[in-house]
Amino acid sequence: MATETHDNAITIASLGLLAYASADIAHHVLGHGGACLALGGSIVSLSSVFVNCSLHGATIDLAGPLANLALGLAALLVAGVARPTATPTRLFWVLVAAFNLMWFSGQLVFSVATGTDDWAWAMHRFSIGAPGRYGLIAVGALCYFVTYFFAAAGMVNLSHPRARARRIILIVWLTAGVTACATAALDHDAVRALLLQAIPQSFLLSIGLLWVPARAASRSTNTSPAAAVSFSVRWVIGAAIVGVASILVLGPGMIATN
């Protein structure tokens, strides 16, 4: 009989908040915002759901998803070398990789399929026709499923019993969504920000996480379950700082003043 493991919900929620915030900040601040400044433009406004640059173009648009791709791949490598016994740290990097790579690949599929969002300008700029669009959609879908399998592999030692992994993922997914919505609620056009940006980029792009526990449990041998995630002051304080800063700064957005 499996020994029941009690993971601390507050610490898990903190890991989820920080992991999701890494994707949001990478996309909007480092990606779009960084490219805007690097190309000599100025940021007119920047929030958790939109960046308005004085310059426009495919480079700035693609910088957001490409920043997610870069951070996601880096996190994947870190998670791969993290000690299996370092449960919170390894779980954090697995989640960072999952949120960033699911954002990149999920948005790629949606943007190319609908001709909107970050990939739209690039498709127009480079005259990408139907065959190219179908190819990009296939690449995005493949990347999403590879990310799903990676996340499941990273959760194997947390998946016995399956209810343990299910609880962890549900807390993480809900925390990400609530954080995104709480931040967007302070936007000057809150309803639009919530319905068209915050909810899709948090709940929908990462919805594949909800199937991770079943996949992880199917691969679990129950030979070396990870230690329980205990209450961690440093993770909780870190999440509190990032969460409050995100809501109060990126929520209403930063607007340039002349």
Provide a role label for each language-model segment.
Residues M1-A9:
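Short, Lys/Arg-rich, polar N-terminal cytosolic tail immediately upstream
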Residues A9, L15-N68, G72:
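Small-residue-rich helix-interface/hinge motifs
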Residues S45-L46, N52-G154, I169-A180, A184-H188, ...:
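Metalloprotease/metallohydrolase-associated module, dominated by Zn2+-dependent proteases
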Residues G80-R90, V156-A165, N222-V229:
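Membrane-interface helix-boundary motifs at transmembrane edges
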Residues P88-R90, V191-A198:
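Short, aromatic-rich membrane-interface segments at the entry and exit
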Residues Q201-W211, G238-V244:
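Alpha-helical membrane-embedded segments
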Residues A217-V242:
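Interfacial loop-to-transmembrane junctions
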Residues S246-N258:
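Juxtamembrane boundary at the C-terminal end of a transmembrane helix
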